[in-house]
A protein has these predicted regions:
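Conserved catalytic core of the tyrosine transesterase superfamily
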Residues: 1-210
Length: 210
């Protein structure tokens, strides 16, 4: 030892989240959902409209949404009212509804999918035999929210998953129903996912006067 302080020659790593807004992504408000939907309709973006509507209805994680196959949501050339898939993360089944306007948008998109002889509902935009990647999906979501004048850094693919779930909870207060729709195994996961603990506590407190 020569008495000198030895300094590390390793380069300093920049934290991945430096300069980024992190944390839970916000759900879209109903007015934002309609703003995006109308823009997609006006621009005749058939694929994006089907993807957006199904993302809202299904409440699926991005990894499950992009892996959907035509046969998951269609039977005999018609779009189902309800569908069930096995979640990639948990290996458990989850069921979701497909509303009338979502069925119509998927039905409009189907001819282009079947024309490619593809099995995936949303094929990759670069390789037709593969499904849309989660990274591609994230970029699409970013474009959607910015087209509606929203801050792209505050929203993400989980915003699509949380949007309808948040509205269902807001209107019904039924956490168990939301848990089932999101495919969570524990109710605590749903509570954390919706970020409702503080809001609920304050709402209860506001109703008590002393």
């Amino acid at each position: 030892m020569d008495g000198k302080i030895q300094t590390s020659l390793r380069p300093t790593n920049t934290p991945w989240n430096k300069g980024r807004i992190t944390g839970q992504k916000r759900p879209l408000k109903p007015k934002d959902v309609w703003a995006i939907r109308i823009r997609l309709q006006l621009k005749h973006q058939v694929c994006d409209l089907a993807l957006f509507n199904l993302a809202i209805d299904s409440k699926l994680r991005g990894c499950d949404l992009v892996r959907l196959q035509v046969e998951d949501v269609c039977a005999g050339g018609r779009v189902r009212d309800r569908a069930t898939i096995i979640q990639k993360k948990t290996g458990r089944p989850v069921q979701f509804e497909i509303t009338e306007q979502t069925r119509a948008s998927i039905q409009a998109w189907l001819p282009k999918v079947t024309a490619r002889d593809g099995k995936y509902l949303f094929p990759s935009r670069f390789r037709a035999q593969l499904h849309l990647s989660t990274r591609q999906y994230a970029r699409i979501v970013h474009a959607w929210v910015e087209s509606a004048g929203l801050d792209g850094s505050a929203y993400g693919t989980h915003s699509m998953r949380r949007t309808k779930a948040a509205q269902i909870y807001k209107k019904t207060g039924n956490l168990r129903a939301v848990q089932l729709l999101l495919g969570h195994t524990k109710l605590e996961s749903t509570v954390r996912y919706l970020g409702i603990e503080v809001d609920d506590a304050l709402s209860i407190s506001e109703q008590v006067e002393l």
